[in-house]
Amino acid sequence: MFELGETSPQNAQIKVIGIGGGGGNAIEHMIAENIDGVEFVCANTDSQALGRSNARVVLQLGDEITKGLGAGADPSVGRQAAEEARDRIREILEGTDMVFLTAGMGGGTGTGAAPIFAEVAKELGILTVAVVTKPFVFEGKKRMDVAEEGIKALGNYVDSLITIPNNKLLNVLGKNITLLNAFKAANNVLLGAVQGIADLITRPGLINVDFADVRTVMSEMGMAMMGTGVSSGENRAREAAEAAIASPLLEDVDFTGARGVLVNITAGMDLSIGEFEQVGEAVKAFASETATVVIGTVIDPDMSDELRVTVVVTGLGSHAGGGAGVPLKPVKNTKNDGTLDYHQLDRPTYMRNQEPSKRTVDLEEQRDRDFEYLDIPAFLRRLEED
């Protein structure tokens, strides 16, 4: 049962730290979107990259080791550079309640330094969420192995970990999309999560959500996913919720028995109790019966017909609660020649899910065919069409 109440002003300190080249690019994208209530930090071994950053705080890693020339794709150099700057990292993190770490895995600085940032954050008791990318397959096995090792090391310290495989950019968006728009789509995953959580904590809303609720959902939960969906019109609540849950750019994860769910609904003054219920029902479909579910709303007078849903799901792959899991059904998103059918994709998700299927696809087959059956959110389709 959900309780309605007033949200008092919050003073939780949220930082987003971009580590290395990939992480730096991600926070530049977020800075351009003018997110309130968040402080950005750019950390790198490359002094030239830091000189181009618009972050309020920049941190040069490994002055003595790299001389400002980068880590040379060597994670051990990135790790040593971060160790050299450990005291400065601690100084930057002190007083922070929640930190997002973002980096590209497989290179030198992000792979080697990110676990050091996470370790220091854990020592300080900071709620830590990492959002990282994995290399394209064509970059080779060695780089992928380096990325996997970095992700494993990061997982030892963070509370929640989200991975975005770059290869999904090819599968979901198609090979003809511009490189700029492809990486913009990946950066939007982090943008949506940070904006959704920051809005819940820092902006007044109708549902009483505070930082303690966020910590409960995300603390020591391991594998996680996050997504954002926006829709308008009669079925906007259901469509936005399902688009947020789809998250085709994220690493393949098993939703069954999710132990924590954080939802932010942002809409105008016309948000109805029925729409609130529709979002809740979409969440109920995959969460464990014993999961901690926190749903908050933010009223934005500037939003007229649009409704935005941000979903953060944690504790994935755990079957302890006996949740029903996500009902995986084949969704026909392609034409007979294998190309994307954009007319079909423009139909609401729930209508496509209700169409009869000629065969049943089990979980493993579904994962192998994620391109054919992927539910692609509207903002990604628009990028492809532009």
From Swiss-Prot:
GO terms for molecular function: GTP binding; GTPase activity. Keywords: Cell cycle, Cell division, Cytoplasm, GTP-binding, Nucleotide-binding, Septation. Coiled coil: none annotated. The keyword Cell inner membrane does not apply. It is found in: Cytoplasm. GTP binds at G21, G22, G23, G24, N25, G108, T109, G110, E139, R143, N187. SUPFAM superfamilies: Tubulin C-terminal domain-like (SSF55307), Tubulin nucleotide-binding domain-like (SSF52490). Pfam families: FtsZ_C, Tubulin. GO terms for cellular component: cell division site; cytoplasm. GO terms for biological process: cell division; division septum assembly; FtsZ-dependent cytokinesis; protein polymerization. Belongs to the FtsZ family. HAMAP family: FtsZ. Essential cell division protein that forms a contractile ring structure (Z ring) at the future cell division site. The regulation of the ring assembly controls the timing and the location of cell division. One of the functions of the FtsZ ring is to recruit other cell division proteins to the septum to produce a new cell wall between the dividing cells. Binds GTP and shows GTPase activity. Homodimer. Polymerizes to form a dynamic ring structure in a strictly GTP-dependent manner. Interacts directly with several other division proteins. This is Cell division protein FtsZ. The gene is ftsZ.
